[in-house]
C-alpha cells in the first residue's frame, strides 16, 4: 500500500513538474499535451492536471518578463508589475486547485502509466512549430504595412498559437513603434493566448471530462484578473 501511494504521489508530482517546465518554452503546447493525457485520468488526478496547466501559465509570465528585460528595459519597466502579479495569481489559483485533490483509497488506487513516448505529443509540438513560423512572418509584415490598427488586431489573433514570435518581433521594433503600443499589444496577446489555452484544454480533454469544471473555474479567474489589470493599464 505504501508503494502504491508513493507511486501515485510521483504521478501527481510529475504532472505539476511537467507544467512548470513546459511553461518555460510553450504554455500552449504544454497545456494541449496535458489535456490529451488527462483523457485517461481518474477523478482524483483531475485537479493536478488543471493545476499543472495553470503553473504553465504562471511560468509563461515569468518567461516573458525575462525576454522583455533582455530586449528592452524601457518596456520591461512598464510591464513587469502586471506580469509579476499575474504570474503569482496563476500560481496561486493552480495551487488552490491542487489542494482540492481528493486522495484515493489505497485499495482502489492505481498509478497512471506514463506514456512519455506518446506520438501525439510530437504531432502537437510540430503543429505549434509551424504556427510559430507563420506568426513570425505575419507579425513582420503587419509591422511593416498595417500600422497600429493591424498590430492591435494581430495581438488578439496571435493568441491562437505561441505568442513568443509576436512579442519578440514587437520588441525588435521599439525604434519604430511606441513603447505604450508595444506594452498594450503584448498584454492583449497574453490575455488572448490564455483564453485560447482554456479552449484548447477543454477541447483536447474531451467531452464529459472530469477536468471541465476545474478548467473553467481556474482559467476563468486568471482571465478575469488579466482583464482587470489591462483596464488599470489603460486608465
Enumerate the predicted regions with their spans.
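Alpha-helical transmembrane segments
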Residues: 78-90
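Single conserved hydrophobic/aromatic residue that forms the stacking wall/gate
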Residues: 1-12
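Juxtamembrane boundary at the C-terminal end of a transmembrane helix
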Residues: 227-235
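Small-residue-rich segments of transmembrane alpha-helices in multi-pass membrane proteins
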Residues: 19-29, 57-61, 113-133, 157-165, ...
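Membrane-interfacial helix-loop connectors
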Residues: 24-26, 32-42, 52-61, 69-74, ...
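Interfacial loop-to-transmembrane junctions
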Residues: 199-222
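Transmembrane helical segments that form the transport core of multi-pass membrane transport proteins
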Residues: 5, 104-177
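Membrane-interface capping segments at transmembrane-helix boundaries
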Residues: 96-106
